[in-house]
A protein has these predicted regions:
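Start-transfer (signal-anchor) and selected internal transmembrane alpha helices
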Residues: 1-29, 347-353
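Membrane-interface helix-loop-helix junctions at transmembrane boundaries of multi-pass membrane enzymes
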Residues: 5-12, 206-217, 268-301, 307, ...
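Active-site lumenal/periplasmic loops and adjacent helix-entry segments of GT-C-fold
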Residues: 16, 20-156, 189, 193, ...
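Transmembrane catalytic cores of multi-pass membrane glycosyltransferases
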Residues: 40, 179-286
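Hydrophobic/aromatic-rich transmembrane helices and adjacent perimembrane loops
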Residues: 100, 306-338, 351
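Extracytoplasmic
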Residues: 103-108, 170, 290-292, 352-522
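Membrane-interface transmembrane helices that cradle and orient dolichyl/undecaprenyl
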Residues: 155-176, 283-289
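Signature aromatic-anchored transmembrane alpha helix within multi-pass, membrane-resident enzymes
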Residues: 220-224, 327-364
């Protein structure tokens, strides 16, 4: 692969700084409107506190939601956060801004990877595409991005330096690659699987022979040795069970053919307007087939197999490369042909797509994006009351305004047990590490509770008497949060709230403009 001429180094560096600054601004403007971490992260918040309470020793279990969840999660970013919190840096502020900073660093990391697998003239374009893809940062800048951002950064750097090692067989690059993969392992398990399997496809591209297999094996083995103090301790404490349970919880059927067609929908690339990047991905796949770039085509479909639950967050790296192929092989030649002779009108035609993508990215981060919901000030006030005035181990049902969102997008559902130190019966987070299909049970419970929003209280009570949920203890409190911005249009929980207020078995024990809490007497 041709290297950059020395004369072009500084212009390239300047362009990279501009693109990275754009990435930082996009992330910052998404985070700033909320005074609380975006969306999820409550379980990791508790785990950081568990580490601090244990004197920075690795706890055996996390106290999150009083569920006896094994502390088997890769702990690197949690320890980094716990250490930074010893400085005058509030923990909630770290959960707001640390993922933002680490996620921004993935842009120059991707640049290093693109330099190894693309022509020099295409590298900055690929980096810009990666920057403008919402999937490259939306889940990384949330509160839960405290782990995802570290995993994404180290996995991309692993691929970049491994590609250098495959090309040059340098001991230095071998050691760096092994160290970076080790950091990925102790940051995020799913991204570890993505990095390891991606190494195989990079080997097919650079060294498709037995020598390449030996290089990949050496990197993986060395990284396992480097991380052995952690995973051997986890195996000694809990065995393989937590990892097998977590892996099983993520498995679900997915049809790659349907997925390819699904790219034309904006829900895959999370574009606000037309799915331009999704369409370019389809065109890029055609180009990769035409060029016989089977390694890239296979890499593109890899996340569907290894991480079916979260593959859209991992596919962004090969997707950016595929889109780059579409632009350089189809769009640029087309525009070059139609804009001759050069004029202001032709320049405008050439810039219309990148300008559109920039506008789309800016629109994505505007307030109101469902991905960037967070716990409100009224909800925080209610949670503080719960922590102060309800008995320890009290059991709650959380009825949040996100009736049409999945459990993973319900910020109150995860942050309530973290901040109140009380039990939320329908919170699935963390239960993927538990046996007996606990994760599936909690997800089902969450869905069942949503089905009771427009019914009377007996709907909630009947859930716990059904055979499926009979093993769970019944709730003692119900916390209902309303979206006041929608009260003039719809209020899914208003009917249930009125029913609870009129029932002799329920007593309103707390109320503020958004939240009402009821105690329940069976």
């Amino acid at each position: 692969m041709p290297s950059h001429p020395k004369s072009s180094f500084f212009p390239t560096l300047d362009s990279l700084v501009i693109i990275t600054s754009l990435a930082f601004c996009l992330r910052l403007f998404a985070v700033l409107p909320s005074s609380f971490p975006l969306n999820d992260g409550g379980m990791f918040y508790t785990m950081v506190q568990d580490i601090q309470a244990a004197g920075f020793k690795l706890p055996m279990f996390t106290s999150f939601n009083s569920s006896l969840i094994p502390f088997a999660y890769p702990p690197l970013s949690l320890y980094v956060t716990a250490l930074l919190n010893t400085l005058p840096l509030p923990l909630l502020s770290l959960f707001r801004f640390l993922p933002l900073v680490v996620s921004t660093l993935t842009v120059p990391a991707f640049f290093l990877l693109a330099k190894q697998v693309l022509k020099s003239k295409d590298v900055l374009l690929a980096t810009l595409i990666f920057t403008l893809l919402p999937r490259s940062f939306e889940w990384q800048i949330m509160g839960g991005g405290i782990t995802r951002s570290f995993g994404q950064l180290f996995s991309i750097l692993t691929l970049a330096y491994s590609a250098k090692f495959f090309r040059q067989s340098s001991k230095t690059y071998f050691l760096i690659s092994s160290l970076l993969l080790a950091l990925t392992i102790i940051s995020h398990l799913e991204l570890t699987f993505f990095a390891v399997s991606s190494l195989i496809f990079l080997t097919l591209h650079f060294t498709p022979n037995f020598s390449g297999i030996k290089k990949v094996s050496a990197i993986i083995l060395t990284s396992l040795i480097l991380t052995s103090p952690w995973w051997m301790l986890i195996l000694a404490r809990h065995g393989l069970s937590p990892f097998l349970n977590a892996a099983a919880s993520g498995l679900q059927a997915f049809d790659p053919t349907s997925y390819t067609l699904f790219l034309t929908l904006s829900s895959v690339t999370d574009e606000v307007f037309l799915p331009v990047l999704g369409t370019l991905t389809l065109l890029g796949l055609v180009v990769t087939i035409q060029k016989r770039a089977w390694w890239l085509l296979s890499w593109f479909y890899l996340p569907i197999i290894i991480a079916p639950r979260n593959f859209l967050n991992f596919i962004v790296v090969p997707m950016s490369l595929v889109i780059t192929h579409a632009v350089t092989s189809l769009l640029l030649p087309f525009f070059t042909h139609i804009i001759k002779p050069f004029s202001f009108r032709s320049l405008l035609a050439l810039l219309i797509i990148p300008l559109y993508l920039l506008v789309s990215a800016i629109a994505f981060i505007l307030p109101g994006n469902r991905y960037f919901d967070s716990v409100s000030s009224s909800e925080k006030t209610a949670i503080e009351w719960v922590k102060q005035y309800t008995p320890p181990n009290s059991r709650f049902l959380i009825l949040s305004p996100q009736i049409f969102s999945s459990w993973g997008m319900d910020s109150l559902l995860e942050w309530f047990p973290a901040l109140s130190q009380r039990i939320s019966l329908a919170t699935p987070q963390g239960t993927e590490w538990l046996p007996n299909h606990e994760f599936r049970l909690r997800k089902k419970l969450h869905q069942k509770i949503k089905g009771c929003y427009l019914q009377d209280p007996s709907c909630l009570e009947s859930i716990f008497s059904s055979p499926t949920f009979r093993s769970l203890p019944i709730f003692q409190y119900i916390l209902i949060s309303r979206d006041n911005s929608l009260l003039s249009q719809a209020c899914e929980v208003c009917l249930l709230t009125q029913q609870l207020q009129n029932s002799p078995r329920y007593k309103s024990v707390y109320q503020n403009p958004q939240v009402t809490i009821f105690s329940f007497s069976p």
